[in-house]
């Protein structure tokens, strides 16, 4: 009897790991940084509210993060005339936490004199929420 219960529990634990967590629609806050390895100027967007975006329920990761950095990169190429930039996004569910990170990024680069950070005008660039589609995993 104990062997049967142990077997059932073992099978339950093994299949639980194979099930993917469903994404949750959440409000998050986000900003982006665009920098080039060949230039000393980097651009930083304002902190923006994103509603809704999809968050991985187990890890808290933002689905399709690369799409948002691609949006910023496309903007930098087409509107700002700055090709070949590397774009990074930062996000948080809490606005205060992200604003703190925003200030740390600016302070870090000013302190090191590594990049001249230029803040984009409010509303110059807007992230567009992406519709989540389930990706097939192998």
Where are these regions (language model features)?
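Bacterial Sec-dependent N-terminal signal peptides
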Residues: 1-23
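N-terminal start-of-chain detector that recognizes signal peptides
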Residues: 2-4, 60-63, 90
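A short linear-motif detector with a strong N-terminal bias
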Residues: 11-12, 67-70, 95-97, 106
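Intrinsically disordered, low-complexity boundary segments flanking structured domains
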Residues: 18-21, 73-78, 104-105
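N-terminal secretory signal peptides
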Residues: 21-69
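Tryptophan-paired
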Residues: 62-78, 83
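Surface-exposed, polar helix/loop patches in the mature regions of secreted/periplasmic/lumenal proteins
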Residues: 81-138
